[in-house]
């Protein structure tokens, strides 16, 4: 996702999650748009692409509610943990008028071998819960990046973000 200055101020409070019709046709997504907390209260809906990154367009922002962009994420990590901190940093980068324009923001999941967190096999047809999430922010004009790999855990606190940074 290529980003420029943050000029959007659309309401991004919508939490109407939905299945992506094309992905459903291809059988490439989870089977339910229900909240993960209904199955396990330690998890909630986590966005790979944050809704506020697209707040210059209501339509684009709401597309982040597609289940193809959502994964079970530790509630702590999502609300005030390390993942939330990366989202805040990206917003700060976009608001910094001294920074040159243009950055790419990429994110994804890493599925490991931890079967103890695979709570959504029946409820959402997810074979595995992501063990880690990653984010990369590439600053085009500076030819540099920030990158993090963060364990999908309630122990992944924002105050520890430096320890998740990758060279």
Where are these regions (language model features)?
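An anion-binding catalytic pocket shared by soluble metabolic enzymes
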Residues: 1-17
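Domain-level detector of nuclease and nuclease-like folds
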Residues: 16, 23-167
């Amino acid at each position: 996702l290529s980003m420029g200055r943050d000029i959007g101020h659309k309401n991004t409070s919508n939490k109407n999650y939905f299945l992506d019709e094309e992905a459903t046709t291809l059988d490439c997504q989870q089977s339910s748009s229900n909240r993960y907390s209904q199955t396990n209260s330690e998890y909630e809906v986590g966005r790979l692409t944050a809704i506020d990154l697209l707040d210059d367009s209501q339509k684009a922002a709401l597309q982040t509610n597609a289940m193809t962009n959502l994964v079970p994420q530790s509630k702590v990590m999502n609300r005030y943990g390390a993942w939330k901190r990366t989202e805040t940093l990206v917003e700060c980068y976009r608001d910094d008028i001294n920074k040159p324009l243009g950055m790419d923001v990429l994110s994804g999941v890493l599925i490991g071998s931890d079967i103890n967190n695979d709570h959504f096999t029946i409820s959402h047809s997810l074979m595995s819960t992501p063990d880690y999430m990653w984010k990369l922010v590439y600053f085009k004009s500076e030819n540099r990046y920030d990158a993090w790999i963060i364990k999908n855990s309630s122990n992944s606190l924002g105050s520890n973000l430096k320890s998740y940074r990758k060279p």
